[in-house]
């Protein structure tokens, strides 16, 4: 803030105008305010903020429906579903979802299991590396591997043909891609 005051005082040389007044004048003349903050090793990071007027619809998102363009909150807007979908889960607006399986368990067990999946490569589309959730409220530090499929049929074939150890938890679902 002190740097902004100093820069603005150089632009507005009047001694009779207070610092808050200088800032208000500057922001009135420059709708895109630039904020500068100091970061490590004497470098600077600059961020420009431009606010769009509330009455202007957001056209950058292809998922808007006519209901959302009328400025309803997202929570009150209807959930979009695909009419030709074979699953009953929630689908995003372009129906670009894929069936998935999360395998949860010991990290080393999942890593070895991932390599055993290579001989069943026709039964899944992709398999992730071993990952885990982080955060303050995470109670279980179990590792996770995610598998994606082209269809629910392919996922069912995978689950019926591939032996999963009893120590691994299997969760099925859908993921937007």
From Swiss-Prot:
Designated name of the protein: Protein E8^E2C
Q: Say which domain of life the source belongs to.
A: Viruses
- Molecular function per GO: DNA binding; DNA-binding transcription factor activity
The answer to keyword Nuclease applying to this record is: no
Keyword Ribonucleoprotein listed: no
Picking any one GO biological process from the record gives: regulation of DNA replication
Q: What is annotated about its quaternary structure and interactions? A: Interacts with host NCoR/SMRT components GPS2, HDAC3, NCOR1, NCOR1, TBL1X and TBLR1.
Per UniProt, subcellular location reads as:
Host nucleus
Which keywords does this Swiss-Prot/TrEMBL entry list? Host nucleus
User: What stretch or stretches form a coiled coil here?
Assistant: none
Q: What is its main location?
A: host cell
